[in-house]
Amino acid sequence: MPRFVDRVVIHARAGNGGNGCASVHREKFKPLGGPDGGNGGRGGSVILVVDPQVHTLLDFHFHPHVVAPSGKPGAGSNRDGAAGIDLEVRVPDGTVVLDENGRMLADLVGAGTRFEAAAGGRGGLGNAALASRARKAPGFALLGEKGQERDLTLELKTVADVGLIGFPSAGKSSLVSTISAAKPKIADYPFTTLVPNLGVVSAGENTYTVADVPGLIPGASEGRGLGLDFLRHLERCAVLVHVVDCATMEPGRDPISDIEALEAELAAYTPTLQGDSALGDLASRPRAVVLNKIDVPDARELADFVRDEVAGRFGWPVYEISTVSRDGLRPLIFALWEMVKKYRDAQPVAAPRRPIIRPIPVDESGFTISSDGEGGFIVRGTRPERWIAQTDFNNDEAVGYLGDRLARLGVEDELLKRGAKPGCAVTIGDVTFDWEPQTPAGVDVTMTGRGTDIRLEQTDRVGAAERKAARRERRQPGESGGEDS
C-alpha cells in the first residue's frame, strides 16, 4: 500500500531577478551611441495548484525543497533577460497552507485552485532604463532582487461527504469496502487502519464520498492514539456517522458510552477551518448511528435493546447493519445520500461572477530611523532596503546613485536631524556602512555631475536652439538696412 502523508513542511524559494546590464551602444560613425543595457528578467514564483490526480503529500516528504528558476540577466543592444518560469507544484484537493506561526494562508479546494507560495524577485534595471536628462550615460546597472523564501506547512484535510468515526475495530473499514470499491486493509486487531480511506458510494444514479478515519479513543483530541493526526480529515465532512461495535467484549464498553466518549472528543477538538468553513464546528454536523455486527446473535440482541434508547437520547437516526451478511446496507446507503443531498441543497449556489481587480495603492515612501545603541542608526523601510539590495557596492557610480536616491527620499535630512555625524555607522537592510553626507542640506542632488558622459559636455556641436538664435541675429541687420534705404 502506498504511504499516506497528510502533513509536511516545505521550504519554498522563488527565483531571483536577473541583474541589469551596463553597456554602451557601439556602431560605426556613431561615437556617442549612448547606453543600451537591457533589464534583468523576473524570477520565477512557486505556485501551488490543486490536482485531482494527487491524493497525498508523500512527494514533499522526500523532497521538501521547492525552488523556482531565476531570471536571466540583461544584455547589450537593449536586450532584456528572460523571465524565470513559474514553478507549479501539484497538491491534493483539500490542502491547507499554514505559515511558520500556524496562521492559515490558503485553503485549496477545487481543481485548478492556485496559491502563490513564494513570489519571484524583480529584475534589475539596465543603464538604458536609468538614463535621464541629469544622468545621460550611467556606467552602472541595478542588481536583481532576491526571490521570496519561506517555510510553509501543508496539511491535507480529506474532502468527503460522509465521515465514519468509531473506536478501533468497530468495522469502519469493512463498511467502506462493502458499500464502495475501496480496498482498505482489514484485520481483527485494533488500529488496523492507519490512514484515511476514501470510497465513492452509489445511491441509484447519485454518488457521494465516504471517508474512513482511523479509530478514535478517549483523549484523541489531546494527542492519544492516532486520532489527533486524523481528526482534521473530519473537518470537511458534511455528515458524521458513529459506527458502533455491538459485539465487543471489552469491559466498560457499550454503545451508549462509546458514542458519549467520541462526542466528548469531537467537542474538545478545535478545527483549523472553523472560522472559514461554512460547515461550522464538528458539534453542529448532522449525525447518524450505525450499530454494526448484528450477524452475531448477542450483538443483534444488544442492538435491538439500545436502538430506541440511542435514538431517544441523541435524536439521531439509527441503523442496524452487518458488513458480513450485508443486512441493512441498502437502506443505510440511501439514507446517507438523503442527508448529504439535504446539506448540498442548503448550500447557496454562487453565481459566476466576472473578476474585478481593484489595485490597492501601496505607499513605500515611508521609513523609520532608530538608534542601534552604539552611536549608529538603523534605517528601516521598503524602498531603502530594496535599493540597498539592488546596489552593486563594487561600482562607485552605483553607490553614488544610491546616495542620491536616499537623499531625495529624505533619509539624509532625517539623519542630520537626529544628530548623525559624518563617519557614524548606518545600517540599512543587511548592509552597514560609514555614512557621509552626499550634499549639504537643501541642495538639489540632481545638479551633481555623477552619471554623465564627459564627451557630451566637450562636444562643439551646435544645437537646434542655438542655430535658430543665430538666424534671428543674421536677419536683424538686413531688416534695419532695408528701412533706411
Curated annotation (Swiss-Prot):
Domain OCT: residue ranges: 359-437
This enzyme's EC code(s): 3.6.5.-
Binding locations of GTP: 166-173, 191-195, 212-215, 292-295, 322-324
Main location: cytoplasm
NCBIfam families: Obg_CgtA, Obg_CgtA_exten, PRK12296.1, PRK12297.1, PRK12299.1
Compositionally biased tracts (Basic and acidic residues): 452-468
Keyword match Heme: no
Record localization: Cytoplasm
Any Gene Ontology biological process: ribosome biogenesis
Summary of subunit composition and partner proteins: Monomer.
Domain of life: Bacteria
Name of the protein this chain belongs to: GTPase Obg
Pfam families, sorted: DUF1967, GTP1_OBG, MMR_HSR1
Record region (Disordered): 450-485
Gene3D superfamilies: GTP-binding protein OBG, C-terminal domain, GTP1/OBG domain, P-loop containing nucleotide triphosphate hydrolases
SUPFAM superfamilies: Obg GTP-binding protein C-terminal domain, Obg GTP-binding protein N-terminal domain, P-loop containing nucleoside triphosphate hydrolases
InterPro entries referenced in this protein's UniProt entry, alphabetically: G_OBG (IPR031167), GTP-bd (IPR006073), GTP-bd_Obg/CgtA (IPR014100), GTP-bd_prot_GTP1/OBG_C_sf (IPR036346), GTP1-OBG_CS (IPR006074), GTP1_OBG_dom (IPR006169), GTP1_OBG_dom_sf (IPR036726), OBG_GTPase (IPR045086)
An example Gene Ontology CC term for this record: cytoplasm
Keyword Hydrolase: yes
